[in-house]
A protein has these predicted regions:
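N-terminal pre-domain/capping segments
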Residues: 1-84
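Active-site beta-loop-alpha junctions enriched in small/polar residues
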Residues: 7-11, 35-37, 61-64, 90-92, ...
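Conserved beta-strand positions in the central sheet of alpha/beta enzyme cores
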Residues: 33, 58, 86, 124, ...
Length: 248
């Protein structure tokens, strides 16, 4: 059976982190993914995770920290036992408007990640939908990022691929040699779940999981990370999604 992780960002609007960790353990999770808002005291966080029987196998890090203080990112990752690090986002104002700009951004990520790779940790990019907007004809930013950064690993957010108008399994296969993690999330039918920004619990939305997960399992992907960008009830999301995903 696939071991599913949980992106703690999904629970950012709910109770104290130690309660979230306990809830996830009770729900049956054994892995979590971190994000920048929770790294203030890595040793205390590691203690809470250990007590609950959870491992933080992957983490998201702001590009500014990776570039300006890579040693801090590495220290946090080691304290928490992470196996891979990803930069998760680029603000709209900072996004390139040309193919050359996206290629340069990939090179920037490649250079920023060198200390992390030298420390023995995979480092890469996590996508949204803006990487699938055509630029200068039929070129796509995600291709350009990965071309500019040939050593970058990929955490493919499967639902954002679909929102971007692409078939997730095609991109899983296209970059199977770079894929070490996926975000497992679901999209509601058009016009539904508007109070949750159009997201749905995994297995209860529009994603074709038979096609997508079968493609992922053809790769060496190590981490399957549940995420919901704005759930009304994080415990509901965590439990319903894990129950559904375990049937994939």
């Amino acid at each position: 059976m696939t071991e599913f992780s949980y992106q703690l960002y999904s629970s950012r609007n709910f109770g104290p982190l130690d309660q979230t960790i306990s809830m996830l353990s009770d729900a049956g999770y054994r892995q979590v993914e971190g994000f920048g808002g929770i790294y203030g005291n890595p040793d205390a966080l590691r203690g809470d995770l250990d007590q609950a029987g959870l491992s933080m196998t992957t983490g998201h890090f702001d590009l500014k920290m990776v570039e300006d203080a890579p040693e801090k990112a590495i220290s946090i990752a080691r304290s928490l036992g992470m196996k891979a690090l990803f930069v998760p986002y680029l603000d709209a104002a900072d996004r390139p408007s040309t193919a050359e700009g996206w290629l340069a951004f990939g090179k920037r990520l490649q250079e920023a990640g060198k200390p992390i790779r030298d420390a023995g940790l995979p480092f890469g990019w996590h996508n949204h939908d803006f990487e699938f907007k055509n630029i200068e004809g039929d070129m796509l930013p995600l291709d350009l990022i990965l071309e500019g950064g040939p050593e970058l690993a990929l955490e493919l957010d499967l639902a954002w691929v679909a929102v971007g108008g692409q078939r997730p399994s095609d991109w899983v296969r296209k970059y199977s040699d770079r894929l070490i993690a996926v975000h497992v999330k679901d999209r509601a039918p058009e016009g539904e779940c508007l109070d949750e920004d159009g997201w749905e619990d995994v297995g209860h939305g529009t994603m074709d999981w038979v096609d997508t997960i079968s493609a992922v399992r053809e790769t060496a992907c190590q981490f399957f990370v549940m995420e919901h960008d704005n759930p009304k009830d994080d415990a509901r999301f965590a439990r319903r999604s894990l129950a559904a995903a375990n049937t994939f």
